[in-house]
Structures are given as structure tokens and as C-alpha cells.
């Protein structure tokens, strides 16, 4: 159903943002009628973003639209942390479950996942930011804070994300790419 959107975004060379929207009404377990303890937001959202990324890759969308750019919320969600599990899991599915998703792609699945862009909205979690940086590189990271969703109307997340980026062991040029350069390039703001 999103193919027309992908066509237009590819034509205009503009990114598609992916943000999770899982609500409290989606239970964590089948025996329940809703998610409890804010689990849907804390962990359901990263799962939902990851599931969207998996579907975009294995459905062939990224082959059909080779120049399309997707910006994922929460620094690529679970993909950077579980990237090796993703590789091994697909190898296992192909060898033992006779899955054919991987064979239908033009390149190794992990290469598609590295094509995504990742925002820095990790609430200032330096270790998670380093994991995202290790997977995507500075060239595929864009500044984001999750403003205004914190207990200080957005100021806390903004302050913590800036602090986390400034504490990264990266060059000033890479820091500038993350803070503004990549977004300016992706959105054609300098034209």
C-alpha cells in the first residue's frame, strides 16, 4: 500500500521517516488484553521499527527503489545491537526452514540494513549511540531528540542527546554530519 509513496519519495530524492506507533492496546502476551507497565512504548516501539525494517528489506522494496532513503527512529531500533543475530538467523532460516527470502535479494541482507539512516533519539544513552554509530557510521546518522516527550517538555532528552553525541570519540567533521550535515543533505536544504 505504500508503493506510491516510495515512488514519489524516490522521485524527489527525499527520505521516508519511520516512527513506531504501537499502542497500549497491543498486548505483550496473548493471554492479556493490553500491554502493561509501559512495555509497549519502551520495548514494543523498537521491535515495531525493527519489524518494519525487516519487511522493507525482505519484501524487495529496497531493490525496487535502490535510491530510497529511510530514517529510522531510536537509532535503527534493535538492528545495530542484534545485527549478527540477524545474519545468523537468516542463514539458519534458509538452510533449515527452506526460506527463500535471502535468495530473492540482489545482495546480502545486512548490506540493506546498513543503507538505513538512524536518528539519535536514544534519550542520551551513550552506549546505544556508540552501537548505532558502529553499525551505521556517522554518514547515516541524523540528530533527533524525541522532543517534547520527556518529563521536562523535551529539554531533558535534548540536553542528554547533545551530551551523548559530544562525548563520542569521533572527529569534529563526523559530529557536524550527525548534528546537521546529514539532515541538510538528505532534505536538500543547501540548494
How would you label these PLM feature ranges?
Residues 1-142:
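Catalytic pocket-lining loop regions of alpha/beta-barrel enzymes
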Residues 59-60, 68, 117-118, 122-142, ...:
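Mid-to-C-terminal alpha-helical segments outside catalytic/metal-binding sites
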